[in-house]
């Protein structure tokens, strides 16, 4: 696998490159992609279909889909994706709950906790978008009618009312309209003046190419009907002409449609391991399109999958650091509960390196100076309440959330640095071990006080990939 910041695999010249659209061998055929986008979980750079997962994942930087639009899985070792954003709160007012998830993605292995690829892990937390819920208001009585909107013929008049009986609260509103209208008649006849309707479309030119026996022309017309002038009382007629004509200008020469030339040679396979993609090209020049003629139909390029049958290098990756060893000092039986600095170490393992990939960068062992407070009785103090934890179980019945106060030890005031060897400077010293803190009893407890609450309006856990189907 190519980790972030690592160089791309070295490309070695193979003894033979195979150009193919090969039938898949081994597992069912999949769609193979050249890139897996960690931020979105989507496959990028479609290489082609009809290949097996094993062939696609010769390059661990690639990714695959079992069907178009399906779940994208990277070819690297499985690990957990980023957490999704929190879903909307299950209620719009008062207290509710919301979910988020992450997925085990990868191939040929398991995520931490022995979880299979494709498995979802959920988190549930309490939420509150708005403290109060909206309360509807009530309308006042209708006000008086306003004057008619016109001075002749028929119009409308309006009356209004206020949303204040009572006023709405917390974003509520009054149902219905704040005003209403009705027809009104002035008993006076208005004159209607004529107005042109919009111009109709231009008629087609008599020819589509220039150079014909007659000069092409186009015409359009309009009607005095928007509205027509009234007779009693008399309205004014429409000003201007009812039609107009013009010459057709700028007509192009008759078009020549383009045609494809022959396909060119197939390009070499661009990779030396895993799958690649070759290309053929052709040119729209047989003939070249002219005078607005249509371009050649179809694609100017076509691609094929090429298989080097060579696995790509896989760089090593460090496991997580192991636990710190006990804090000891050479030639001393025990330094616990004493102002005597010692040393401790932890290690890690470089795993997964194959096919001449890069070795893990960095040290395999980490050493630090320490004071041992293992099983030391120390005076303690109660911490403040922790923040509320996640709702557990996120997908089970009756989830609850909890917070705690802990009896935390007060560490001894030993020197924070030591000089173990003269001339090598000061070294930081870390406290190590599990002390035995002692606090005054709180709510009947000596070490941990816990408070629990139920999570409200809990939504169901649903796979987002299934919701898209």
Swiss-Prot record:
According to the record's subunit comment, the protein's assembly and interactions are: In plasma, properdin exists as dimers, trimers or tetramers in the relative proportions of 26:54:20. Interacts with the pro-C3-convertase enzyme complex (C3b-Bb) comprised of Complement C3 beta chain (C3b) and the Complement factor B Bb fragment (Bb), where it binds (via its TSP type-1 5 domain) with C3b and Bb. This interaction stabilizes the complex and allows it to become the active C3-convertase enzyme complex (C3b-Bb-FP). Interacts with C3b. Interacts with CFB.
User: So which residues are the signal peptide here?
Assistant: 1-27
Functional summary from the UniProt entry:
A positive regulator of the alternate pathway (AP) of complement. It binds to and stabilizes the C3- and C5-convertase enzyme complexes. Inhibits CFI-CFH mediated degradation of Complement C3 beta chain (C3b).
Positions of region (Interaction with Complement C3 beta chain): 351-359
Give the span(s) annotated as Disordered: 219-238
Q: GO CC terms for this protein?
A: cytoplasmic side of Golgi membrane; endoplasmic reticulum lumen; extracellular region; extracellular space; specific granule lumen; tertiary granule lumen
Q: Name one Pfam family in it.
A: TSP_1
Q: List where in the cell it is found.
A: Secreted
Disease association reads:
Properdin deficiency: Results in higher susceptibility to bacterial infections; especially to meningococcal infections. Three phenotypes have been reported: complete deficiency (type I), incomplete deficiency (type II), and dysfunction of properdin (type III).
Q: Name one GO biological process term.
A: defense response to bacterium
Q: What is known of its domains?
A: TSP type-1 domain 0 binds to TSP type-1 domain 4, and TSP type-1 domain 1 binds to TSP type-1 domain 6. These interactions mediate multimerization.
Q: Which UniProt keywords apply?
A: Complement alternate pathway, Disease variant, Disulfide bond, Glycoprotein, Immunity, Innate immunity, Repeat, Secreted, Signal
Impact of mutating residue 275 to A?
Answer: Inhibits oligomerization
Paired cysteines (S-S): 32-56, 43-72, 57-75, 89-127, 93-133, 104-111, 132-170, 148-184, 152-190, 163-174, 205-248, 209-254, 224-238, 269-306, 273-312, 284-296, 327-370, 337-376, 350-360, 391-455, 395-461, 407-439
Q: Which domain of life is it from?
A: Eukaryota
Q: Which residues are glycosylated?
A: 83, 86, 92, 139, 142, 145, 151, 196, 199, 202, 208, 260, 263, 272, 321, 324, 382, 385, 388, 428
Please report the stretch or stretches of sequence annotated as the TSP type-1 domain: 28-76, 77-134, 136-191, 193-255, 257-313, 315-377, 379-462
Give the principal location in a single coarse category.
secreted
**Protein name (record):** Properdin
- Effect listed in the UniProt record for changing residue 244 to R: Inhibits oligomerization
